[in-house]
Regions:
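Cys-dependent protein tyrosine phosphatase-like superfamily
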Residues: 1-115, 127-187
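Ser/Thr-glycine-rich phosphate-binding loops at phosphate-binding pockets of nucleotides
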Residues: 120, 124-125
Length: 187
C-alpha cells in the first residue's frame, strides 16, 4: 500500500469503517491539495504525538492554519530510540499509560475527523491506532495488518535510518507484530 498523500510516506485511513481517522507520519510538506482533501472529508482536528524537541525542530504547517484545531499531545516515552527488539518491546510498554488513554479519548471524542501523527507514523501512531481500533471492536488481525502496512510504506526510509545509526538493529526499527500484540493484551 502506498501513502494516501504524495507529500508523506505513511498516510492512510484507519480501518475503522467510518473514515474519521487518518494516521500518518509528520505532514510537514503537506500540499494545498492535500489540505483540501482533509477539509473536504471533515478531518479538521490535528493531533501531534511528537515530543517537544521534534515538534520544535520540524514544525507541522497545519499548526498555524486556522481551519484546523491543532493539539500537541506527546506520547510518553516517544523520545526513546531502542537498539534491540527487547528494548523496543519495553518502549512500547512505556507508551501504554494514562496519558496515552487520554490521547485516544481525545481523538475518539473529537467533533470532527482527526489526523494524528508522530515522526514516522509507525510506533507512537501505531500504538494509538491499535488502541483506537481495539476500543472500536475491530478484530486483532485487522489491527495487526494495519500496523504492518508501515513496514512496507517505510522500508526505504528505515534502511536509511539503519545506515545512519549502525548500532541499531534493523529488527528494532522495523514494525513487528509482537510489539502491537503485546499492547493489545494490556487493553
Amino acid at each position: 500500500m502506498s501513502s494516501l498523500f504524495k507529500s508523506t510516506w505513511n498516510t492512510r485511513w484507519l480501518p475503522s469503517g467510518d473514515y474519521r481517522y487518518i494516521r500518518t507520519d509528520c505532514p510537514r510538506n503537506i500540499t494545498e491539495e492535500e489540505i483540501g482533501f482533509l477539509i473536504e472529508h471533515n478531518i479538521l482536528t490535528v493531533v501531534d504525538l511528537r515530543e517537544e524537541v521534534e515538534y520544535v525542530k520540524r514544525p507541522c504547517p497545519l499548526e498555524n492554519d486556522n481551519r484546523f484545531k491543532y493539539l500537541h499531545m506527546p506520547v510518553s516515552g516517544g523520545d526513546v530510540y531502542p537498539v534491540t527488539y527487547e528494548e523496543t518491546m519495553k518502549a512500547y510498554d512505556t507508551m501504554m499509560d494514562d496519558n496515552l488513554l487520554n490521547i485516544v479519548d481525545t481523538i475518539m471524542n473529537s467533533a470532527t475527523g482527526v489526523i494524528y501523527f508522530c515522526a514516522a507514523g509507525k510506533d507512537r501512531t501505531g500504538v494509538v491506532s491499535a488502541v483506537i481500533l481495539k476500543k472500536l471492536g475491530v478484530d486483532e488481525k485487522t489491527i495487526l495488518d494495519d500496523y504492518m502496512i508501515s513496514k512496507d510504506n517505510l522500508m526505504v526510509r528505515l534502511e536509511k535510518i539503519k545506515q545512519e545509526h549502525p548500532n541499531q538493529t534493523i529488527r528494532a526499527i522495523i514494525p513487528h507484530p509482537d510489539y502491537v500484540k503485546n499492547i493489545l493484551k494490556k487493553i
